[in-house]
UniProtKB/Swiss-Prot annotation:
One of its GO terms (biological process) is L-leucine biosynthetic process. It catalyses: (2R,3S)-3-isopropylmalate = (2S)-2-isopropylmalate. Pfam families: Aconitase (PF00330). NCBIfam families: leuC, PRK05478.1, PRK12466.1. Its cofactor is [4Fe-4S] cluster. GO terms for molecular function: 3-isopropylmalate dehydratase activity; 4 iron, 4 sulfur cluster binding; metal ion binding. InterPro entries: 3-IsopropMal_deHydase_lsu (IPR004430), Acnase/IPM_dHydase_lsu_aba_1/3 (IPR015931), Acoase/IPM_deHydtase_lsu_aba (IPR001030), Aconitase_4Fe-4S_BS (IPR018136), Aconitase_4Fe-4S_dom (IPR036008), IPM_dehydratase_rel_enz (IPR050067), IPMI_cat (IPR033941). Belongs to the aconitase/IPM isomerase family. LeuC type 1 subfamily. It is an enzyme of class 4 (lyase). This is 3-isopropylmalate dehydratase large subunit. Its EC number is 4.2.1.33.
Length: 475
């Protein structure tokens, strides 16, 4: 009888092609997602060595990082480097015969939104991409993580990857979340507790009642930021919600293949008695709407808190806090709700899905953004955009004073025209608040979609619960 195994153990074991004496393994890769920034050198490497893509049917490409989110982008991209990278992906996709969603295709969008949306991401798979937020796909019970450009070439050529196994970490969120608290608050709160190095060397399995109660889109948000917590990947065991989400998607199994897949997927859970190397437990009811105040995702506090002082920290974090406060232009003791906001960005692979847009629109309905506020919504894919327009969400955003954009990574990172100006302060639903992440000397506060919408209305960081519609009193 085999020893109890974790979900990570099971997926890993199912994909080991060969294991060396030192523990290094050759892993088979089921899905390879590709975008325009980390792939050009990899494809050129194939050309130079006369190789083909080993499994073009398992390789999916989409431009997202560099593409503008304004009309006319399918005919002209002004930035030369961005244009060259997008054109290179277009040519490489044609030359090597891989699946491709060009800018002109309504299915185009952020690669980590397109993959699940199209049914490419399935439970039990290994999924890689030259992008750190590949962990998103772990929401399906897939082992998904980012790889470097040389590894991109290796996977293109061999459909395998050389890896050493990580350790197992469990993050359990018990109980239920309170109203106004979201998946984004969960993942930021975990990072705030463990730090950005807390998951280093581990693959995290997220579990507990609060995780089970999340939708698939919420689970993707949680797993998306596993990398910000230092982990190699994040996983959530698949369940009936997972199967319902996947069923009927363009590239999901059909007929007898679906039944066979479903039988396998139902074995993908951590066995009773399986051992984790590290365990973190948080009570769901203790999580509040949160916001980052500094320049690291671990600099996170409940919106009801005040800006900390360097003296509140120890060791090397004292100087780090001092630098963060200086860069962010904040004063210790200042209420987080007193911090003025210039710009609001709703989008990214963390929070650019239809449920994220619904949550923001619910807060914005019938309201206007604060005077002078720059606010934009960037759907995560063309299909999300179309659905939001069909549901009337787009009109709510437009009526409130938001810009309604085309799909792309947009202001999550300063690699396209959507950027902050020096000193500009943004409430953002993205995943990183590093110095210059959204533009040189730009200041980023990470929040949930509802919190971003609240800040857009009031002009400052705001507790979304103060703007939520109170439930009707029972008769």
């Amino acid at each position: 009888m085999t020893a109890p195994r974790t979900l990570y153990d099971k997926i890993w074991d199912d994909h080991v092609v060969h294991q060396s004496e030192d523990g290094t393994c050759l892993l088979y890769i089921d899905r390879h997602l590709v975008h325009e920034v980390t792939s050009p050198q990899a494809f050129e490497g194939l050309r130079m060595t006369g190789r083909k893509v080993r499994a073009p049917e398992k390789t999916i490409a989409v431009p997202d990082h560099n593409v503008p989110t304004t009309e006319g982008r399918d005919t002209k991209i002004d930035n030369e480097e961005s244009r060259i990278q997008v054109e290179a992906l277009d040519k490489n996709a044609r030359d090597f015969g891989i699946n491709y969603y060009p800018v002109s295709d309504i299915r185009q969008g952020i690669v980590h939104i397109v993959g699940p949306e199209q049914g490419w991401t399935l439970p039990g798979m290994t999924v890689v991409c030259g992008d750190s937020h590949t962990a998103t796909h772990g929401a399906f019970g897939a082992l998904a993580h980012g790889i470097g450009t040389s590894e991109v070439e290796h996977v293109l050529a061999t459909q395998t990857l050389i890896q050493k196994k990580s350790k197992n970490m469990k993050v359990e969120i018990t109980g239920s979340l309170r109203p106004g608290v979201t998946a984004k608050d969960i993942t930021l709160s975990v990072i705030g507790l463990t730090g950005t190095a807390g998951g280093t060397g581990y693959v995290i399995e997220y579990c507990g009642q609060a995780i089970r109660e999340l939708s698939m889109e919420g689970r993707m948000t949680v797993c998306n930021m596993a990398i910000e917590g230092g982990a190699r990947a994040g996983l959530i065991a698949p369940d009936e919600k997972t199967f319902a989400y996947v069923m009927g998607r363009p590239h999901a199994p059909k007929g007898a293949a679906w039944e066979a897949a479903l039988a396998y997927w139902k074995t993908l859970f951590t066995d009773e008695g399986a051992q984790f190397d590290k365990v973190v437990t948080i009570r769901g009811e203790d999580i509040a709407p949160v916001v980052t105040w500094g320049t690291s995702p671990e600099d996170v506090l409940p919106i009801t808190a005040t800006v900390p002082a360097p003296e509140d920290f120890t060791g090397g974090k004292v100087e780090a806090a001092r630098r963060s406060l200086e860069y962010m232009g904040l004063t210790p003791g200042q209420k987080l709700t007193d911090i003025k906001i210039d710009t609001v960005f709703i989008g990214s692979c963390t929070n650019g899905r239809i449920e994220d847009l619904r949550a923001a629109a619910e807060i914005l309905k019938g309201k206007k953004v604060a005077p002078g506020m720059r606010a934009m919504v960037v759907p995560g894919s063309g299909l999300v955009r179309a659905q939001a327009e069909e549901e009337g969400l787009a009109q709510i955003f437009i009526d409130a004073g938001f810009e309604w954009r085309l799909a792309g990574c947009s202001m999550c990172l300063a690699m396209n025209p959507d950027q902050l100006s020096p000193g500009e302060r943004c409430a953002s639903t993205s995943n990183r608040n590093f110095e210059g992440r959204q533009g040189r000397n730009g200041r980023t506060h990470l929040v949930s979609p509802g919190m971003a919408a609240a800040a857009a209305i009031t002009g400052h960081l705001t507790d979304v619960r103060d703007l939520m519609t109170a439930p009707a009193e029972p008769a």
